[in-house]
């Protein structure tokens, strides 16, 4: 067993040869390297698969024996300071290794087909392999310095991949935004690491935890300074895991290729912040108020992410805000002392969200031949609808991923999310109310995405997205005010002012008659695509296979954490995998499982989720058109004052959600403009004052020299006379002031 642990250091470096080989190949033999580009995809998958096998072996040993192994190499700087580099294998490490490798393999297989048309295919796989190496190195690090090194490498890879299509201004701006926002967190993390080293004199986790615990217990350290250092460490996790208020980079990160979105949101970048909190949890628990701070940030992020997802039209941005909200749940759990639930939800959410992002990539892939390759069109849910008949496999996988994220049993996220929701009652009723309410919002906005994408009819044929004002085609609206005059049911298509506000819940569907189909066929031929079919098509098997594998994970991964132990079979593998002493809320974890409490809480959570799904079906499903035909909705709002009030509330919610809570506007107008103004002021002072003084001295010296040169005339007698005259003047002044 120990023999396997001794070679665990190889795991992070297994994907790295692909990056080196592609880089050297493109530099030395670019033509041959490009001709064999599919071979590099094969080697990427192969090497990461070997890493997965090693990781699975370590995980099995961890489950059976809970053996913790650490090995370090010392690098002595001088007699008083040395750095140690090594690796640590414990339950947390083995969980993250399995998560990164399994999701990474699925994303690499998917990317082979998804990126096959792209000129940057090889560059993409080089970045991806380096991304996996960086994340694997991060989770196996044995000290804070090593974590910081790989932390920066993860940030660099995310910057390269978010801005992969750097010729697009939006992608270039997005990667810069992600980089700058994470600079704030990384700077906080560095300050926190240095502060803790100043207190404890060690970067090693075990030594650091033990020394700090003793210092705080004996009141030998300033508790405020220790809390500040811990808060700075947490700031790094806040930025990396897109927690409030450093979440603004996450939706813009969707400018990168969809496989990268899946990897970032499931197993790499956003998981790095959660991993850091989990790794440093023994430190946070001994410092007052830090746990409260972590839980507060988590619950704010839970609610904020859910509300911002309500009005998004881009399918990937909707999923991004969903990730933000779910990461809030995961961050909330360790803050309230539920360490096990946090890692459980990290696992289940990773597979479900990877499935959803790969599904969205399949949807985008099917829409691009029809609407073009611009993300504003191919990712716009307004132009979708009715895709269930064109992409049935993608629809089924996306549906299962949506149900899982909504917390529907027996799918994966139901078990982990319910555990967090139940634990919030033990911590704070206010936090519990917010967390449970957000569970309903999650079901609402996730089924909003599903219904806008797959329900009804293909809306692209009804849309005017060519920016022409004189189009006679109706633009389907999602949010805003209804057109006040009644719809003429005899017209197949009606006009609408393009400047009109979007409607809040409207998703109009129409019966397509024979004339309508003819008009659709005529309209669709105007795009001039090379594809003969003007309807979406299912993705290739290479893209569908990873999605089907992730469906299996979504169906069955939740069973590893079910706390059922009836003496015959113990399904709770996760509890044996993790260290139970860290779970602060359940010190009596060995007690028998309470079936009644579990079923009661499950009924409540599922009911709330069903309510959100029901509301989504009413406002976005095909049934909404029936309500419109029966005029049931208008019967509830016939009183003008009530309708005006409801419209104001609805538009207020829409403006809040669509404008991202005005947080980006605040950062842009207050922080960015203030910093830019300060920079311009400093630039003016440097150029006019500092440079002015320097240049002024030079100019004055020049003119003085020229004047002296003209007076001297080149004769030695003149120089002697001026020298004697100057000395005489100085002596007279000295004599005068002395007496």
UniProtKB/Swiss-Prot annotation:
Relate the protein's function as given in its record. NDH shuttles electrons from NAD(P)H:plastoquinone, via FMN and iron-sulfur (Fe-S) centers, to quinones in the photosynthetic chain and possibly in a chloroplast respiratory chain. The immediate electron acceptor for the enzyme in this species is believed to be plastoquinone. Couples the redox reaction to proton translocation, and thus conserves the redox energy in a proton gradient.
Gene encoding the protein: ndhF
InterPro entries attached to this UniProt entry = NADH_UbQ_OxRdtase_chlpt_su5_C (IPR002128), NADHpl_OxRdtase_5_subgr (IPR018393), ND/Mrp_TM (IPR001750), NU5C-like (IPR003945), Proton_antipo_N (IPR001516)
**Enzyme Commission numbers on file:** 7.1.1.-
Q: What is this protein called?
A: NAD(P)H-quinone oxidoreductase subunit 5, chloroplastic
Pfam families membership: Proton_antipo_C, Proton_antipo_M, Proton_antipo_N
* Gene Ontology cellular component list: chloroplast thylakoid membrane
What binding partners and quaternary form does the record give? NDH is composed of at least 16 different subunits, 5 of which are encoded in the nucleus.
Transmembrane annotation, as ranges:
9-29, 39-59, 89-109, 125-145, 147-167, 185-205, 224-244, 258-278, 280-300, 327-347, 354-374, 396-416, 425-445, 544-564, 603-623, 716-736
Keywords, ordered alphabetically: Chloroplast, Membrane, NAD, NADP, Plastid, Plastoquinone, Quinone, Thylakoid, Translocase, Transmembrane, Transmembrane helix, Transport
In which family does this protein belong, per the annotation? Belongs to the complex I subunit 5 family.
Where in or outside the cell is it found?
Plastid, Chloroplast thylakoid membrane
Membrane topology according to the record: Multi-pass membrane protein
Q: Which Gene3D superfamilies match?
A: 1.20.5.2700
Q: What class of enzyme is it?
A: translocase
| Annotated catalysed reactions | a plastoquinone + NADH + (n+1) H(+)(in) = a plastoquinol + NAD(+) + n H(+)(out); a plastoquinone + NADPH + (n+1) H(+)(in) = a plastoquinol + NADP(+) + n H(+)(out)
Q: Which GO terms describe its molecular function?
A: NADH dehydrogenase (ubiquinone) activity; quinone binding
Query: What does the record list as GO biological process?
Result: ATP synthesis coupled electron transport; electron transport coupled proton transport
């Amino acid at each position: 067993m120990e023999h396997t642990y001794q070679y665990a250091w190889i795991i992070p470096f297994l994907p790295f040869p692909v990056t080196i080989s592609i880089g050297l190949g493109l530099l030395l033999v670019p033509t041959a390297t490009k001709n064999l580009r599919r071979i590099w995809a094969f080697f990427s998958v192969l090497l990461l698969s070997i890493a997965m096998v090693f990781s699975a072996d370590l995980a099995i040993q961890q489950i059976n024996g809970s053996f913790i192994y650490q090995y370090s190499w010392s690098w002595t700087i001088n007699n008083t300071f040395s750095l140690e580099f090594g690796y640590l294998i414990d339950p947390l490490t083995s969980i993250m290794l399995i998560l990164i490798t399994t999701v990474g393999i699925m994303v690499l297989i998917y990317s082979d087909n998804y990126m096959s048309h792209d000129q940057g295919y090889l560059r993409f796989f080089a970045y991806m392999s380096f991304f996996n190496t960086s994340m694997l190195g991060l989770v196996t690090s044995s000290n804070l310095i090593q974590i910081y090194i790989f932390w920066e490498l993860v940030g660099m890879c995310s910057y390269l991949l978010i801005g992969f299509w750097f010729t697009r201004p939006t992608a270039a701006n997005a990667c810069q935004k992600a980089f700058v926002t994470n600079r704030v967190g990384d700077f906080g993390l560095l300050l926190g690491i240095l502060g803790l080293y100043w207190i404890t004199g060690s970067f090693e986790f075990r030594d650091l935890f033990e020394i700090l615990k003793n210092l705080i217990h004996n009141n030998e350290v300033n508790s405020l300074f220790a809390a500040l250092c811990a808060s700075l460490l947490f700031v790094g996790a806040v930025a990396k895991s897109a927690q409030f208020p450093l979440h603004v980079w996450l939706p813009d990160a969707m400018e990168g290729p969809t496989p990268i979105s899946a990897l970032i949101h499931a197993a790499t970048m956003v998981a790095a912040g959660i991993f850091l909190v989990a790794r440093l949890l023994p430190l946070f628990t001994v410092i007052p108020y830090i746990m409260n701070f972590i839980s507060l940030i988590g619950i704010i992020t839970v609610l904020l992410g859910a509300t911002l997802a309500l009005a998004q039209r881009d399918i990937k941005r909707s999923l991004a805000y969903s990730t933000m909200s779910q990461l809030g749940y995961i961050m909330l759990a360790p803050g309230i002392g539920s360490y096990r639930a946090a890692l459980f939800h990290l696992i289940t959410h990773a597979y479900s969200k990877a499935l959803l992002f790969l599904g969205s990539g399949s949807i985008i892939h099917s829409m691009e031949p029809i609407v073009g390759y611009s993300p504003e069109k191919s990712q716009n849910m307004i132009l979708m609808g009715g895709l269930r008949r064109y992409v049935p496999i993608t629809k089924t996988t996306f549906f299962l991923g949506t149900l899982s994220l909504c917390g529907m049993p027996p799918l994966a996220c139901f078990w982990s999310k319910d555990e967090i929701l139940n634990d919030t009652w033990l911590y704070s009723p206010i936090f519990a109310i917010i967390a449970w309410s957000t569970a309903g919002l999650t079901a609402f906005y996730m089924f909003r995405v599903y219904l806008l994408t797959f329900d009804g009819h293909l809306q692209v044929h009804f849309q005017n997205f060519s920016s022409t004002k004189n189009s006679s085609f109706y633009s389907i609206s999602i949010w805003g005010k209804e057109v006040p005059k009644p719809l003429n049911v005899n017209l197949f298509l009606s006009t609408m002012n393009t400047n009109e506000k979007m409607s809040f819940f409207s998703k109009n569907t129409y019966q397509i008659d024979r004339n309508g189909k003819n008009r659709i066929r005529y309209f669709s031929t105007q795009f001039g695509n090379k594809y003969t079919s003007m309807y979406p098509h299912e993705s290739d098997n290479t893209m569908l296979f990873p999605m089907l594998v992730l469906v299996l994970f979504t169906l069955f991964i939740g069973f590893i954490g079910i706390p059922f132990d009836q003496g015959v079979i113990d399904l709770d593998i996760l509890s044996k995998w993790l260290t139970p002493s860290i779970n602060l809320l359940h010190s009596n974890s060995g007690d028998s499982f309470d079936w009644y409490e579990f079923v009661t809480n499950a009924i409540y959570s599922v009911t709330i989720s069903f309510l959100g799904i029901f509301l989504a079906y009413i406002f976005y499903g095909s049934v909404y058109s029936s309500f419109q035909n029966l005029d049931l909705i208008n019967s509830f709002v016939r009183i003008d004052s009530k309708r005006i009030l409801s419209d104001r509330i609805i538009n207020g919610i829409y403006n809040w959600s669509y404008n991202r809570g005005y947080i980006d506007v605040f950062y842009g107008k207050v922080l960015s403009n203030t910093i830019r103004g300060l920079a311009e002021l400093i630039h003016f002072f440097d150029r006019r004052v500092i440079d002015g003084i320097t240049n002024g001295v030079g100019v004055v010296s020049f003119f003085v020299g020229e004047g002296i040169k003209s007076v001297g005339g080149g004769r030695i007698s003149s120089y002697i006379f001026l020298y004697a005259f100057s000395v005489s003047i100085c002596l007279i002044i000295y004599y005068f002031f002395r007496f």
